[in-house]
Amino acid sequence: MPAYRSRTTTHGRNMAGARGLWRATGMKDSDFGKPIIAVVNSFTQFVPGHVHLKDLGQLVAREIEAAGGVAKEFNTIAVDDGIAMGHDGMLYSLPSREIIADSVEYMVNAHCADAMVCISNCDKITPGMLMAALRLNIPAVFVSGGPMEAGKVVLHGKTHALDLVDAMVAAADDKVSDEDVQIIERSACPTCGSCSGMFTANSMNCLTEALGLSLPGNGSTLATHADRKRLFVEAGHLIVDLARRYYEQEDERVLPRNIATKQAFENAMALDIAMGGSTNTVLHILAAAYEGEIDFTMDDIDRLSRKVPCLSKVAPAKADVHMEDVHRAGGIMSILGELDKGGLINRDCPTVHAETLGDAIDRWDITRTSSDTVRKFFRAAPGGIPTQVAFSQEARWDELDTDRENGVIRSVEHPFSKDGGLAVLKGNIALDGCIVKTAGVDESILKFSGPARVFESQDAAVKGILANEIKAGDVVVIRYEGPKGGPGMQEMLYPTSYLKSKGLGKACALITDGRFSGGTSGLSIGHVSPEAANGGTIGLVREGDMIDIDIPNRTISLRVDEAELAARRTEQDAKGWKPVEQRKRRVTTALKAYAAFATSADRGAVRDLGDR
């Protein structure tokens, strides 16, 4: 029987000093011997997705204590990608994922915690904590802060549902008045919570449901709704049960690596493809699999993308649909339910809350459940009142959206498209692959060819787009923005938003070794691997070269013959794989350390220390 890890610091004469320190935190004689549960919070006043988490760690802690455990809370950092967007702050976003994973490992291992509840929400926090959970492999439950309500605004007599991206696009559109921009800005992000579309934060929180590490509703229940409190309460009780099952009953099935198996990762990726999740999820899923020593690669993603259809389109792919609408249609368990009906998931994978994912779907899919409680849960609606307070409203939809032919969630017989919402492309410009969110690509440009317009940084591309240098039919190439070349692999939300504001969202393509915000739509192809800084072919593209993109056939090619590419490579080797001109970018010691070990995106941009 495995001993509680915490006994290392709580038992034995020689641990008198450690016990003295534990007593100073409030522990009593009766607490020594109970499981010590780390409550891994990520509260910060910088991020709307985390601003309401301050008291939620203690809510979970009280439930842990009530269930017979000892709760100890600490915080990780949390970067707001939206606020960090469009300037050098974005260099820090992806590297923060590794810092978060490391900080969780440091705290949990230094203090010998037995298990943990991870309170995450936004873009890099859920992935960082997920990486830590699989690295540590102790009982863990995830509960996120929940999505923001969609903004609502009346413009020129018409009601619009809004999100962050609408504010960015409007601000760059000369045809939108200053007054209207102000109205949109003030309405786009009305409440606490992760931004309201199927952006990176919400995508990742949905995927934790499919991985089996969070409770049903984790990805879709609004941050403001009273129903979300139940998830935090239940997580506190559940983690104590999981800890006891492992340490007292030798039940290894409750460990993260035995829940989030390769089959579970396939389920998560199938969900991601079906719901058109953020392309960032590919990075994070690959990184989490790496930490769990799970053989899950771009080839697996490519295989799944060829057979899983697109069953849901949410903003930015469908501007008037947000997470509150997905919840009303049954949330993630109902998307998984439709995939299950099509034989596209592994039903036998265990979860933290049910014996198998199949059992969970049978109870929580609104099209098959007999539970009135479940049906009421998914009628949780937005309150429509701006607030930064969690659980502050109890609004309900009058009825659920169970329309699987024309509703927010479709059946496999009536998909938005037979091809899924994400695709892996390969070709001479991306020998190790690249990613496109097909759910956000207009059907008219699934096949596209055009001349390259080459930029050596995001800043240069933005300047060119705003100066009207880009024309319909162009392929914008932004390079040296990968994990190593950036460093930090910046998101390209501003370039894609500005293309949309110029009316080029369906008339141009953009490819990069950087990445995209979950708010990006259009023919935006990221994660080109190998990246330019690693000698990737994207570093050999020249102004005017023709690039051919064929999403149905999963190819992307630079129309330059091999002899010419070889000559260019020899020339570039001599010059060094770096931007032609010095960029006005302060690369600090912290960023240099990340760049020194960062891999290309096809490996999840994880650190390669040469030990695997």
From Swiss-Prot:
Modified-residue entries (N6-carboxylysine), positions: 124
One of the GO biological process terms: isoleucine biosynthetic process
Domain of life: Bacteria
Pathway note: Amino-acid biosynthesis; L-isoleucine biosynthesis; L-isoleucine from 2-oxobutanoate: step 3/4; Amino-acid biosynthesis; L-valine biosynthesis; L-valine from pyruvate: step 3/4
Cofactor names: [2Fe-2S] cluster; Mg(2+)
The protein's name in its UniProt record: Dihydroxy-acid dehydratase
Quaternary structure (record): Homodimer.
Protein role: Functions in the biosynthesis of branched-chain amino acids. Catalyzes the dehydration of (2R,3R)-2,3-dihydroxy-3-methylpentanoate (2,3-dihydroxy-3-methylvalerate) into 2-oxo-3-methylpentanoate (2-oxo-3-methylvalerate) and of (2R)-2,3-dihydroxy-3-methylbutanoate (2,3-dihydroxyisovalerate) into 2-oxo-3-methylbutanoate (2-oxoisovalerate), the penultimate precursor to L-isoleucine and L-valine, respectively.
Molecular function, one GO term: magnesium ion binding
Residues the record lists as binding Mg(2+): 81, 123-124, 491
Source species taxonomy: Bacteria, Pseudomonadati, Pseudomonadota, Alphaproteobacteria, Hyphomicrobiales
Binding site for [2Fe-2S] cluster: 122, 195
Listed GO CC annotations: cytosol
UniProt-listed Enzyme Commission number(s): 4.2.1.9
Record carries keyword Ribosomal protein: no
Pfam families in UniProt: ILV_EDD_C (PF24877), ILVD_EDD_N (PF00920)
Enzyme class: lyase
Disulfide-linked positions: none
PANTHER family: D-XYLONATE DEHYDRATASE (PTHR43661), D-XYLONATE DEHYDRATASE YAGF-RELATED (PTHR43661:SF3)
Keyword field: 2Fe-2S, Amino-acid biosynthesis, Branched-chain amino acid biosynthesis, Iron, Iron-sulfur, Lyase, Magnesium, Metal-binding
InterPro entries to which the protein is assigned, alphabetical: Dihydro-acid_dehy_C, DihydroxyA_deHydtase, DiOHA_6PGluconate_deHydtase_CS, ILV_EDD_C, ILV_EDD_N, IlvD/EDD_N
